[in-house]
C-alpha cells in the first residue's frame, strides 16, 4: 500500500526553508535542538488562541531570535507590548541566552495549512458538520487564489461506531512535483466521541529557481501610463 511522504520534508532545501537556522559544534547541537523544541512547545501552549501559523528560530552570536508568524498579531503583542515582553523573558530563561522576538503577520490565513486545519478542528469541536467545515475551508482557499487544496478528516465522523476517513479536493495538488509550493499541516479535534484528525494540503503554485527565488523580495509590478493616440487634425 502506497504511503505519502511529508510534503515539507521532501522539499527542504529545494523550495522549503528550515524552521530552525543555526550552526553548532557537536557538543552544543543537542542542547540547541532541545532548546528549540522547548521554546516551540512553550509558545504554542501560551499562544493557543492567537492563530499561530509557524515559529522560526535563529541563533546569531550566543543569542536566540524567534519569529512568530500569526494571523492575530495584536493578541501576541498585547497592550503596549506587555505580553511580548513577558514572552521574551520566558524564552530567554528557557534557552539560557538573550532572546529577541519578532512578530510577522499572516496576511491570508485562508491560504495557511496550519490555520485552516486548526479552524476545521475547532469547528468539529463545536459540533459543526464535518462536510460543511471541509467544504467551507476549500471554498475560502480557492476564492483567495489557491491553485488547489485537499482536506482529509479521519475518526468517528458524526459519532459513527466505525472510524473512517473522508476527503475533499478542489483544483490540483501535485505531491510529486518538487518545485510545487505545497503547504501541509495537521490538527486534532477532541470531541465527545474521540479524537478526529485533520490534514490539509494547499497548492499555491510552482516556484521556478528554487531557494534562490525565495530569497529575492517580490517585485511589485509597476503600471505604466497608457499612451493616448493623438488625432490627425489641422495644426
Curated annotation (Swiss-Prot):
What Gene3D superfamilies is this protein classified in?
Answer: 3.30.300.20, Ribosomal protein S3, C-terminal domain
Offer a single GO CC term for the protein: cytosolic small ribosomal subunit
Q: Does the keyword Cell division apply?
A: no
**Entry keyword Chloroplast:** no
- Region Disordered: list its residue ranges: 216-235
List the CDD domains hit by this protein, alphabetically: KH-II_30S_S3
The Gene Ontology terms for molecular function here are: mRNA binding; rRNA binding; structural constituent of ribosome
**Which Pfam family, an example, fits this chain?**
Ribosomal_S3_C
In terms of superkingdom, the source organism counts as Bacteria
Q: Residues in domain KH type-2?
A: 39-107
GO BP terms: namely:
translation
SMART domains, A to Z:
KH
Query: What keywords appear on the UniProt entry?
Result: Ribonucleoprotein, Ribosomal protein, RNA-binding, rRNA-binding
* Assembly: Part of the 30S ribosomal subunit. Forms a tight complex with proteins S10 and S14.
Give a short account of what the protein does.
Binds the lower part of the 30S subunit head. Binds mRNA in the 70S ribosome, positioning it for translation.
The entry's family comment says:
Belongs to the universal ribosomal protein uS3 family.
Q: What is this protein called?
A: Small ribosomal subunit protein uS3
Q: Source species, please?
A: Aggregatibacter actinomycetemcomitans
Gene for this chain? rpsC
